Amino acid sequence: MPKIKKVVATVWYDKENMRALRQVFPEAEFCYVDFYDKDKLEQEVKDADVCILMGDVDPCILGENTLKWIHCDHAGLNGSARPEVFARGIPVTGAAGRSAPVLAEHCIYFMLQNCYHTKELLAAQAAHHWGVDGSNQWRGLYGRTVGIVGMGNNGRMLAERLHALGMNIVAYDKFPIKGFDYIEK
């Protein structure tokens, strides 16, 4: 692998994660640039080997520079998959699946809110009523059926968690779904 001398990053990491990122490139000069400061970003990448972006590839980094790798710190590279990016011949990578655990939990959070009528419960609590009509009919997620469209990183992570909650899962994906014998396809 060629020696990496300079890394430019625009990611908004906390101190601990920024320190961990710097340790990936221990010998390199490390330069943080605000993603929205396009002039400084364009200037700093001129002699950089690696650029780690919080967003998509911006035209300001496609000028004259020494970049050998661009990493977009998010899933989905549609905004960076453009002819002018490919023309440079610089590998562009993304972070598919990075947020899958949090997104799965986010889905479950809303599913539970819906099952347990959180809005009604909070309104009753604010009115100092400690019972809600019909609450004896409410039931949780266990035994219910859920549909998941797309079994990429997020869909797989969600399926694993919903299976642990005892849900029946029906899933659809454009590719064969492998390794999930509990899913109805």
Which positions does each model-derived feature cover?
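Short gly/ser/thr-rich secondary-structure transition/capping motifs
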Residues: 31-36, 50-54, 125-134, 178-185
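An N-terminal-biased, well-structured beta-alpha scaffold segment characteristic
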Residues: 1-93
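Phosphate-binding beta-alpha-beta segment of Rossmann-like dinucleotide-binding domains, i.e.
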Residues: 90-145, 160, 172
